[in-house]
C-alpha cells in the first residue's frame, strides 16, 4: 500500500489482539535468518495447557530428493495466565507446525494469573552459501515433541521444538565442475518463506522502489549420491539472450494455495493463521539468460512481516549442489510483485525445475474487519491460483466498562549492535467500546516476571508515545493497521500526563474519556547478544468503579543456521518437574522447575558433549548428538529440594531418571531423560492459653482458648496461611519448607496479652503477639501465646451550657441534653456513640485500659466554649475533641461546654436627597424612624427607632432569617430599591429580608426623600345671573365653609372663603381628595359644569385628584332666591304679576333635600307664562314658575308650570297632595298638569279653580323660601331648586351639585334630561317639581287659614 502521507510504498500490517501471530526478524548475521515467535498475553483467560500440532515436511516432488536447511526454534514461554477480576476465555489457540523450511508455533502457558495467547512464529529457513563452498549441508525437518494436555493419566511432555539436521558430506570438486555442454539438471526443490508481520513497514520514504533482495534462497541438495550423468543432459553452450524478456508463457507451474487454520479452531484470523503456497515450476529450455518470470499476489496477501528488513528473505534461487545462482529476485512491494531473472544457468542446463513452498499471510490492511469469502490469489507466470476464507477477528479484551486491544506492529532487532540494537512498535486500542470512563489510565510495561530475558524497555530517553483520538462511530482496523490521518493527534494534550516509572513502565492519564484512543509506543530494544531473547510488553486499562482490562504481547527470537558436519545427529532432552506427591511419576498439575543444569557426557569417553539449563517450564534440549550412549547428569537443584524416587512405573518418558542416568541415542531423538524433585514439608505451631495468674507461663490448671486467629507470614511479611485455635487452644501450620517464619496472634476479644518469655522453658512461656519461628529440617511446635481476661472501666462526664462563656462549669449552668458523643480508639475507629441525658450527662462503659478519643458534636445553635480555662479538669471544658486515658480505673473528667452565640442586625435610614437609591456622602440619616424585626413566620420580635444619625440595631440575635420593616417617616417617600451594586449602600426598601450566619449583618438600610406638597382651592362667587359661570362683575362670597376629605373620607382640613370668596388648602400630597362647599343660607346652588371652562361651578361636592401639581380650579357659585311672592292675592291677577313669581318660590323649599333631582331645573320657561305657558316645554319642569316673575301675572301665570307632568311626582308625594294644589289654573295649560297623576291625584279637585287663587297663591313667597315649610317634607323638593334657572326657557338641564373632576380638573357632564338613559333623572326632576308645587299650594292654604 502507499504511505498515506509521503505516497511512498509501504506495507502496514496490524497484529490483532487475542490471536496468534507469525513474525520473522532479520538480524545482521551472515548466513543466518532470525525467526520470531510471538504471543499475545491476555489477562483474565481460563487455565488451559499449551497444545501443539505436529506435522512433517514432505518433498514437493518425489522424483526430486531435497532436504530442508537446518533450523532451530526456541519457543517463547506462553503459559496461560490467571488474573483475578478478569473474564475467562477458553478459546485459546496453539499451533506448532513444521513444514519444509517453515515452522509456525504458538502456545499458552501460565504466567502469574495472566493468560497468554501465543502468536504464531513464522519460520523462514534461509542459508547463505559462500561462493567458494562446493557443498551445502543437508537437513530435514522432523516433528518435535511438544508440551500437550495430559488426559487419562498421561504425563505432560515438555514444551520442546527443535529441528533434526542431516548434513551430507561435501561432494568432490569433480562433481562441481562446470560442463561446457548444456546438461540436464536434477529436479530442484526450492523452498522460500516470505515472512509476514502485522506491522506498518516503510519500504522507501521517497518512492515506490523495488527492493532487491540479497538473502539467497538455497535449493535443497539431493539426499541421494550425486551423479552428474543421471537425469541431467548437458546442453551445448549457447550465447545468452541479448534482450531481457518476460517468459511467463514459458513457465509451467503446478500450484496449490491453502488456507492453514494453524490452531485448528475453525476460525481464520490474519496474522495468526496463514496461507501455504506450494508450486512445482518447470522452465522451458527456450528461456535464456536475462529472461524473467513473475510472481504476482493479490492485495489481500502479504509476504513479509513485522521487520521491514525481512523483505530480503525473498532471495535468489540457487542450486544447492554447487551454490550456483539460477535466478535473482527483485521484490516490488508497492505492486505486490516478485520478479525472478534467470542467470546463464539456464543457458547451460536443460529441463530446469524448481519447487517453492512459501508461507504467506493475509493482509490486515485490506481486511480491516471480519468478512466472509475473502479472496486470496497468487499468479506464477501466467497461472493464477485462488482460494477464499471467512475472516473472523477475535473480540477485544473487555472487563466491565474497560476495553483494550494491542499488538506489536513493527520490530527490527539487531543482535549484538550496541549503537543500534533495533526498535519495536506497539499499537494499543484504548476504549474501543466507546464507554464513558472516569479517571481512565493506561499502563504500558515492558516487564513480566516470567520473562527475565525480556529485551523490551520503556523510559523517557528511548520511548516515543503518540496518542490519537478516534472519532465517534469510527471503525478501527481489527488488524491494528491504523490510518492516523483519519484520527486526531492529541499527543500534545497528554505530554504532561505521561509518567514513566520503574520496571520499564509508563502511565498515561486520560482522565474522563468517552471515546476511543489509539496509542502508538515506539521504543528501542535493549542491547543483547542473545540469539534467543524474548520481548514482552503488557498493557492495562483501568478506570474508577470498573475492573481493569489487561493483556500483553510477546515475541520470541530464534536463529536458523545452515551447515553441519556430515553425519546424522539427534537430540537428548525431557523435563525437570516438582513431584509434589513424591511418587516419582509426572502427573497432571505438577509443574516444571527451571534453572536446573543438565550436562551430557559421552558415556564411552566421558567427554562432555552438551549442556543446557531448564527453561521456566522445566524443559531442556541438547541437540547435535550422533548415535551412542550418553550419561545425563542434573545439578544446581533449587535450594531445599530433594530428589524423588527413580524408575517408578513402566513409562520411561514419565518416570524420573534420578540425578544421573545413561540413555541411548539410536537413529532418533531420545527425550526420556527427566528428573523429579520435591520440597520436604514441616509443621509449625503450639498453643494459646488463658493465663489466669498472669505470670506468662502455662500452668497445669490453665486451659486453652479456642477460636484465636493465628497468622503465618514469610520473612518479607507476606501472609502465607491463617488458622484458628481448636477447642483445646491448639493450632498448627502444615506443609512448610525450611525457613524463617513470622507468627502473629490476634488478641481474643475481652483478653489482654500476658507477659512475654517469663520463664526459661520456651515450650511453656508466652511468645507474645508476634514471634519468629525457624524450621530447619524438623517441625517447630514451640510457638505459643498467653492471654488473661481484660478488666473493664467507664469513661464520661458532662456537657453543659456555658452561659457566661468562661469555659468552666458554674453551679447555675445547666446540662445540654441530646448531644452526640463519639468514642474512638487510637486508630480513629468508632467504638461507641451515645447522647447526653436530660441533665447533660453521658458515659461509655466496658472499656479496657488504653487511650481513647472522645468527640462531642456541637449542638445546633451553639458554639464551643473556650478549652482548659481552669486548673480543675473536672469542671473545665475539654473542647469538641479530646483524648481520655483509662489506666486501671474509670475516667469521669471528659466534659465539654457550649454557649449560644448571638449577633447584631441593622444599619441605617437616610434621606436620599437626590432620590437615586444610594447613600451619598452628603446625605444624612433620618432619626426617629420606626423599624420592626420579625421572624420567618411574621411574628414581631423587636421594634426600635433610628437614632439621631439614622442608625438602628437589633442585638442578641441567633443565626436565622429575619424580616425587617421600615415605617415611612411623616413627610417622606421611600426611595428606589437596590439601585446600585453595593448592598451596604443601596436601599433595601420598606420590607426586606436579612440573614444572620455566624456573623453580624449590618447591611439592611432604607432611604427616603421628602414628599413634595401641593395646594388646592379657588373661588366661591355670587352667580347673579344664574348662568353657572363666573362673570367679571360677579363677586366672591365670603365665609363659605369648605371642607377637604382624604380618599378614606376622613376630614383633613376645613376653611372659609375670604372676603373675596377665595379659599385654599396647602401642604397636600399627591392623591385623591373630596371638596365639600357648604351652601350659604338663603342662597341657591347655581348650575354646575355648564361649560368646559374652569370658570363654571363645580357643585357642592367635588372629587379631585392631585398628581404632582397644584389645583386651583375648584370653585362654586350661588344665587339669591326670589321672594316677592306677593301673592297679592287674589290673583288678581291683575297684574297678575306678581304672583308670578309667586310660584317661584316653588322651589325654594326644595332644597331640602336637594335631592335630587336636580333637575328641577328647568323651570325654564318660566314664566312665560304667558301662559302660553305652555312651557310645555316639556320639561318644564322646572316648575318653571320660574318666577320669572313678573309678570304676567296674568295670572294665567299659570305658570302652570305645566311642568307638571313629570308626574313622576315622585316622592314627595306624601305630601301634600293637598292637591288643592289645584294649581289652579287648571287652567290652562292645558295639559298642564296633566301630570296628574302623579300623585297628586288630587288634582282633580281643585280645579275649583276659582283658582283665582291666583293670588294668594303666589304666596309666593315666602314660602319659597325656603321651604321653611318645606315641611313638605322636604322631600321632594329636592330639586325644587331647580328652578334656578329661571331661565326659562332654555331648558338646559340642571346639573347636580355633586360632580366629579377628572385629572385635568374638568367637570364630567351629566346626561341631558332628554337623553333616553336619563329617564330616572327626568322622573326625579318632575317629581321634585310636583312636590314643590304641592308644597307651595299647601303652604298658601295654611297662610290663608292663618289670616
Swiss-Prot record:
Positions of the UniProt region annotated as Ligand binding A region: 36-568
Motif YSIRK-G/S signaling motif, chain ranges: 23-34
Bias (Polar residues): 62-71, 94-109, 146-155, 163-173, 860-869, 972-981
Propeptide boundaries: 1314-1347
Membrane topology listed for this record: Peptidoglycan-anchor
GO cellular component, one term: extracellular region
Record's keyword annotation contains Calcium: yes
Signal peptide feature range: 1-35
Domain CNA-B: 569-680, 681-791, 792-901, 902-1012, 1013-1123
Main subcellular localisation: secreted
Extent of Basic and acidic residues compositional bias: 130-145, 174-183
Post-translational modification Pentaglycyl murein peptidoglycan amidated threonine, affected residues: 1313
Keywords: Calcium, Cell wall, Peptidoglycan-anchor, Repeat, Secreted, Signal
Acidic residues composition-biased segments: 1091-1101, 1118-1286
UniProt region (Disordered), positions on chain: 55-185, 857-883, 972-992, 1078-1323
Location within or outside the cell: Secreted, Cell wall
One biological process term in Gene Ontology: cell adhesion
Assembly behavior: Interacts with host DSG1; this interaction increases S.aureus adherence to keratinocytes.
Family stated for the protein in its record: Belongs to the serine-aspartate repeat-containing protein (SDr) family.
Role noted for this protein: Cell surface-associated calcium-binding protein which plays an important role in adhesion and pathogenesis. Mediates interactions with components of the extracellular matrix such as host DSG1 to promote bacterial adhesion to host cells. Contributes to the resistance to killing by innate immune components such as neutrophils present in blood and thus attenuates bacterial clearance.
Entry protein name: Serine-aspartate repeat-containing protein D
Annotated source species: Staphylococcus aureus (strain MW2)
Gene this chain is encoded by: sdrD
Amino acid at each position: 500500500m502507499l504511505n498515506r502521507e509521503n505516497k511512498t510504498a509501504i506495507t502496514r500490517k496490524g497484529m490483532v489482539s487475542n490471536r496468534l501471530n507469525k513474525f520473522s526478524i532479520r538480524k545482521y548475521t551472515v548466513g543466518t535468518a532470525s525467526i520470531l515467535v510471538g504471543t499475545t498475553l491476555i489477562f483474565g483467560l481460563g487455565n488451559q495447557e499449551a497444545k501443539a500440532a505436529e506435522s512433517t515436511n514432505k518433498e514437493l516432488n518425489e522424483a526430486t530428493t531435497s532436504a530442508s536447511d537446518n533450523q532451530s526454534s526456541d519457543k517463547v514461554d506462553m503459559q496461560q495466565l490467571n488474573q483475578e477480576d478478569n473474564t475467562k476465555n477458553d478459546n485459546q489457540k496453539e499451533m506448532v507446525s513444521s513444514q519444509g523450511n517453515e515452522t509456525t508455533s504458538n502456545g499458552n502457558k501460565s504466567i502469574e494469573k495472566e493468560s497468554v495467547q501465543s502468536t504464531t512464529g513464522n519460520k523462514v529457513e534461509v542459508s547463505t552459501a559462500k561462493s567458494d563452498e562446493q557443498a551445502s549441508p543437508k537437513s530435514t525437518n522432523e516433528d518435535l515433541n511438544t508440551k500437550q494436555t495430559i488426559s487419562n493419566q498421561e504425563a505432560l511432555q515438555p514444551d520442546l521444538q527443535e529441528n533434526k539436521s542431516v548434513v551430507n558430506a561435501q561432494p568432490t570438486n569433480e562433481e562441481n565442475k562446470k560442463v561446457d555442454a548444456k546438461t540436464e539438471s536434477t529436479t530442484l526443490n526450492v523452498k522460500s518463506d516470505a515472512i509476514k508481520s502485522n506491522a506498518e513497514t516503510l519500504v522507501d520514504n521517497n518512492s515506490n522502489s523495488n527492493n532487491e533482495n540479497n538473502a539467497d534462497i538455497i535449493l535443497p541438495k539431493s539426499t541421494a549420491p550425486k551423479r552428474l550423468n543421471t537425469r541431467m543432459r548437458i546442453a551445448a553452450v549457447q550465447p545468452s539472450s541479448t534482450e531481457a524478456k518476460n517468459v511467463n508463457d514459458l513457465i509451467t507451474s503446478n500450484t496449490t494455495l491453502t488456507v492453514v487454520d494453524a490452531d485448528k479452531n475453525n476460525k481464520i484470523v490474519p496474522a495468526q493463521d496463514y496461507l501455504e503456497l506450494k508450486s512445482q515450476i518447470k522452465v522451458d529450455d527456450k528461456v535464456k539468460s536475462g529472461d524473467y518470470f513473475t510472481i504476482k499476489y493479490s492485495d489481500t496477501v502479504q509476504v513479509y512481516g513485522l521487520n521491514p528488513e525481512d523483505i530480503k528473505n525473498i532471495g535468489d534461487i540457487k542450486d544447492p549442489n554447487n551454490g550456483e545462482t539460477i535466478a535473482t529476485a527483485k521484490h516490488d512491494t508497492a505492486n505486490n510483485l516478485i520478479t525472478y531473472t534467470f542467470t546463464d544457468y539456464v543457458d547451460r542446463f536443460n529441463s530446469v525445475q524448481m519447487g517453492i513452498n512459501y508461507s504467506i499471510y493475509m493482509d490486515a490492511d485490506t481486511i480491516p474487519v471480519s468478512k466472509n469469502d475473502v479472496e486470496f490469489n497468487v499468479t506464477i507466470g501466467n497461472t493464477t491460483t485462488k482460494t477464499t476464507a471467512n475472516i473472523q477477528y477475535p473480540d477485544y479484551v473487555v472487563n466491565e466498562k474497560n476495553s483494550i486491544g494491542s499488538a506489536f506492529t513493527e520490530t527490527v532487532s539487531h543482535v549484538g549492535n550496541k549503537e543500534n540494537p533495533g526498535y519495536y512498535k506497539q499499537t494499543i486500542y484504548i476504549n474501543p467500546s466507546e464507554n464513558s470512563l472516569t479517571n481512565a489510565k493506561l499502563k504500558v510495561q515492558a516487564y513480566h516476571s516470567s520473562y527475565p530475558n525480556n529485551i523490551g524497555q520503556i523510559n523517557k530517553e528511548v520511548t516515543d508515545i503518540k496518542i490519537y483520538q478516534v472519532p465517534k462511530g469510527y471503525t478501527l482496523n481489527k488488524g491494528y493497521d491504523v490510518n492516523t490521518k483519519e484520527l486526531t493527534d492529541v499527543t500534545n494534550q497528554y505530554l504532561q500526563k505521561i509518567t514513566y516509572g520503574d520496571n520499564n513502565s509508563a502511565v498515561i492519564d486520560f482522565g474522563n474519556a468517552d471515546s476511543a484512543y489509539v496509542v502508538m509506543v515506539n521504543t528501542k530494544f535493549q542491547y543483547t547478544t542473545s540469539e534467543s531473547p524474548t520481548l514482552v510488553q503488557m498493557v492495562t486499562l483501568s478506570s474508577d468503579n470498573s475492573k481493569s482490562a489487561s493483556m500483553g504481547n510477546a515475541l520470541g527470537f530464534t536463529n536458523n543456521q545452515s551447515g553441519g558436519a556430515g553425519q546424522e545427529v539427534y537430540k537428548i532432552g525431557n523435563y525437570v518437574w516438582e513431584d509434589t506427591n513424591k511418587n516419582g511419576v509426572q502427573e497432571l498439575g505438577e509443574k516444571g522447575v527451571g534453572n536446573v543444569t543438565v550436562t551430557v557426557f559421552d558415556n564411552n569417553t566421558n567427554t562432555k558433549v552438551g549442556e543446557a539449563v531448564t527453561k521456566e517450564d522445566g524443559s531442556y534440549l541438547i541437540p547435535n548428538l550422533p548415535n551412542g550412549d550418553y550419561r545425563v547428569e542434573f545439578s544446581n537443584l533449587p535450594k531445599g529440594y530433594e530428589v524423588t524416587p527413580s524408575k517408578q512405573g513402566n513409562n520411561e518418558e514419565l518416570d524420573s531418571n534420578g540425578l544421573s542416568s545413561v540413555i541411548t541415542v539410536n537413529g532418533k531423538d531420545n527425550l526420556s531423560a527427566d528428573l523429579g524433585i520435591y520440597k520436604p514439608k514441616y509443621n509449625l505451631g503450639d498453643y494459646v492459653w488463658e493465663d489466669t495468674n498472669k505470670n506468662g507461663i502455662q500452668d497445669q490448671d490453665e486451659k486453652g482458648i479456642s477460636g484465636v486467629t493465628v497468622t503465618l507470614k514469610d520473612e518479607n511479611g507476606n501472609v502465607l496461611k491463617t488458622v484458628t485455635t481448636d477447642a483445646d487452644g491448639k493450632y498448627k501450620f502444615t506443609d512448610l519448607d525450611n525457613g524463617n517464619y513470622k507468627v502473629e496472634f490476634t488478641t481474643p476479644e475481652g483478653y489482654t496479652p500476658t507477659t512475654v518469655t517469663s520463664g526459661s522453658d520456651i515450650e511453656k512461656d508466652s511468645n507474645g503477639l508476634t514471634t519468629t519461628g525457624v524450621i530447619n529440617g524438623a517441625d517447630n511446635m514451640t510457638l505459643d501465646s498467653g492471654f488473661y481476661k481484660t478488666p473493664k472501666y467507664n469513661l464520661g462526664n458532662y456537657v453543659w451550657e456555658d452561659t457566661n462563656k468562661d469555659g468552666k462549669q458554674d453551679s447555675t449552668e445547666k446540662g445540654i441534653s441530646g448531644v452526640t458523643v463519639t468514642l474512638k480508639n487510637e486508630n480513629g475507629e468508632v467504638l461507641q456513640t451515645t447522647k447526653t441525658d436530660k441533665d447533660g450527662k453521658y458515659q461509655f462503659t466496658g472499656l479496657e485500659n488504653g487511650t481513647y478519643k472522645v468527640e462531642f458534636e456541637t449542638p445546633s445553635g451553639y458554639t464551643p466554649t473556650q478549652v482548659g480555662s481552669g486548673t480543675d479538669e473536672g469542671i473545665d471544658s475539654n473542647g469538641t475533641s479530646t483524648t481520655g486515658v483509662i489506666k486501671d480505673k474509670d475516667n469521669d473528667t471528659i466534659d465539654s461546654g457550649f454557649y449560644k452565640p448571638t449577633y447584631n442586625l441593622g444599619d441605617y435610614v437616610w434621606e436620599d436627597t437626590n432620590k437615586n437609591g444610594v447613600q451619598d456622602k452628603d446625605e444624612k440619616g433620618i432619626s426617629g424612624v420606626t423599624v420592626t424585626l420579625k421572624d420567618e413566620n411574621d411574628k414581631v420580635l423587636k421594634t426600635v427607632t433610628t437614632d439621631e444619625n439614622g442608625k438602628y440595631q437589633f442585638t442578641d440575635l441567633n443565626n436565622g432569617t429575619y424580616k425587617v420593616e421600615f415605617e415611612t417617616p411623616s413627610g417622606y417617600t421611600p426611595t428606589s430599591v437596590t439601585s446600585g451594586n453595593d448592598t451596604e449602600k443601596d436601599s433595601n426598601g420598606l420590607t426586606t429580608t436579612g440573614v444572620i450566619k455566624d456573623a453580624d449583618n449590618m447591611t439592611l438600610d432604607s432611604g427616603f426623600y421628602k414628599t413634595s406638597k401641593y395646594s388646592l382651592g379657588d373661588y366661591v362667587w355670587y352667580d347673579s345671573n344664574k348662568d353657572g359661570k363666573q362673570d367679571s362683575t360677579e363677586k366672591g362670597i365670603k365665609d363659605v365653609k369648605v371642607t377637604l376629605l382624604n380618599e378614606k373620607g376622613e376630614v383633613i382640613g376645613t376653611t372659609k372663603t375670604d372676603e373675596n370668596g377665595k379659599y385654599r388648602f396647602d401642604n397636600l400630597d399627591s392623591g385623591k381628595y373630596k371638596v365639600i362647599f357648604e351652601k350659604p343660607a338663603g342662597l341657591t346652588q347655581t348650575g354646575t359644569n355648564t361649560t368646559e371652562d374652569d370658570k363654571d361651578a363645580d357643585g357642592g361636592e367635588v372629587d379631585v385628584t392631585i398628581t404632582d401639581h397644584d389645583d386651583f380650579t375648584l370653585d362654586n357659585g350661588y344665587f339669591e332666591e326670589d321672594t316677592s311672592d306677593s301673592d297679592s292675592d287674589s290673583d288678581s291677577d291683575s297684574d297678575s304679576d306678581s304672583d308670578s313669581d309667586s310660584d317661584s318660590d316653588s322651589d325654594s323649599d326644595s332644597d331640602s333635600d336637594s335631592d335630587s333631582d336636580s333637575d328641577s331645573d328647568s323651570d325654564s320657561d318660566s314664566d312665560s307664562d304667558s301662559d302660553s305657558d305652555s312651557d310645555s316645554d316639556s320639561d318644564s319642569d322646572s316648575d318653571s314658575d320660574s318666577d320669572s316673575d313678573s309678570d304676567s301675572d296674568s295670572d294665567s301665570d299659570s305658570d302652570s308650570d305645566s311642568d307638571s307632568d313629570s308626574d313622576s311626582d315622585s316622592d314627595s308625594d306624601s305630601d301634600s297632595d293637598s292637591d288643592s294644589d289645584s294649581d289652579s289654573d287648571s287652567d290652562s295649560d292645558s295639559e298642564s298638569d296633566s301630570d296628574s297623576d302623579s300623585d297628586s291625584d288630587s288634582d282633580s279637585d281643585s280645579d275649583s279653580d276659582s283658582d283665582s287663587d291666583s293670588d294668594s297663591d303666589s304666596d309666593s313667597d315666602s314660602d319659597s323660601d325656603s321651604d321653611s315649610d318645606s315641611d313638605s317634607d322636604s322631600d321632594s323638593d329636592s330639586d325644587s331648586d331647580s328652578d334656578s334657572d329661571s331661565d326659562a326657557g332654555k331648558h338646559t338641564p340642571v346639573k347636580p351639585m355633586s360632580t366629579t373632576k377628572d385629572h385635568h380638573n374638568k367637570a364630567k357632564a351629566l346626561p341631558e334630561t332628554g337623553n333616553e338613559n336619563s329617564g330616572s333623572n327626568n322622573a326625579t326632576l318632575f317629581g321634585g317639581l310636583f312636590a314643590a308645587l304641592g308644597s307651595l299650594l299647601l303652604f298658601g292654604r295654611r297662610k290663608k287659614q292663618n289670616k
